[in-house]
């Protein structure tokens, strides 16, 4: 069986360099390109890459994906900063290349994906739910893509269940004291030296609380999800948002 030809974009970052090692160690994959800032995207086509693992920046990701889709190269994307407009533009590109697949994953940690799923399942059974994400101080976006996605899934589950609005008697507050409001779910961001990537979902009802927490202690925790994404995206055309769709959780 021929090996899957994989390229990594963003190799100078911590997750990118870890992804290079993970692909090199995978028996069913061959690392054909490792690109950093300033390297030519044409290398992807020249080396016959089948999948590009995109781990760059919000400023670079759209240009990188435009190139990949135009050349029929599947993509596994961990870069954040996705808006409705950007997703619509990407879907437009994919419509012109219907056999190409793109996976965008707010988080590649299997445990983090399961945390989102557990929170989604539990949310309709509790009156109150809030999300707290905790990361290292070098993270450039807040709240994290994982926390935003978690809140969206929670809100969707509560809407489908017909849940009442969350109780909150706050009348006056300092700006930001109640966190960001994501579809009616408060999301709080902590930036602290010594942390990597952590999230907890706090759920409350009369007389009880439930906390669902996940901790990534090393960048290696993201590698099984990245490799899974690379293997599955080649047979999943179009746009897939969220690694949970490749985990058969339903």
Swiss-Prot record:
Kindly indicate whether the keyword Transit peptide belongs to this entry: no
Q: Which amino acids does the record list as binding NAD(+)?
A: 10-15, 78-80, 105-108
Catalytic reactions on record: (S)-2,3,4,5-tetrahydrodipicolinate + NAD(+) + H2O = (2S,4S)-4-hydroxy-2,3,4,5-tetrahydrodipicolinate + NADH + H(+); (S)-2,3,4,5-tetrahydrodipicolinate + NADP(+) + H2O = (2S,4S)-4-hydroxy-2,3,4,5-tetrahydrodipicolinate + NADPH + H(+)
In terms of Pfam families, this protein maps to: DapB_C (PF05173), DapB_N (PF01113)
The UniProt entry annotates the active site at 135, 139
User: Does this entry carry the keyword Oxidoreductase?
Assistant: yes
Q: Where would you find this protein in the cell? A: Cytoplasm
Q: What is its EC number?
A: 1.17.1.8
User: What pathway does this protein act in?
Assistant: Amino-acid biosynthesis; L-lysine biosynthesis via DAP pathway; (S)-tetrahydrodipicolinate from L-aspartate: step 4/4
Q: Record's SUPFAM superfamilies?
A: Glyceraldehyde-3-phosphate dehydrogenase-like, C-terminal domain, NAD(P)-binding Rossmann-fold domains
Cite the Gene3D superfamilies for this sequence. Answer: Dihydrodipicolinate Reductase, domain 2, NAD(P)-binding Rossmann-like Domain
Q: Which residues are involved in binding (S)-2,3,4,5-tetrahydrodipicolinate?
A: 136, 145-146
Q: What broad class of enzyme is this?
A: oxidoreductase
- InterPro entries, per the entry: DapB_C, DapB_N, DapB_N_CS, DHDPR_bac, NAD(P)-bd_dom_sf
Q: Name one GO biological process term.
A: lysine biosynthetic process via diaminopimelate
The similarity annotation says:
Belongs to the DapB family.
Q: What does this protein do?
A: Catalyzes the conversion of 4-hydroxy-tetrahydrodipicolinate (HTPA) to tetrahydrodipicolinate.
Protein known as: 4-hydroxy-tetrahydrodipicolinate reductase
Task: Please report the organism this UniProt entry assigns to the protein.
Answer: Streptomyces avermitilis (strain ATCC 31267 / DSM 46492 / JCM 5070 / NBRC 14893 / NCIMB 12804 / NRRL 8165 / MA-4680)
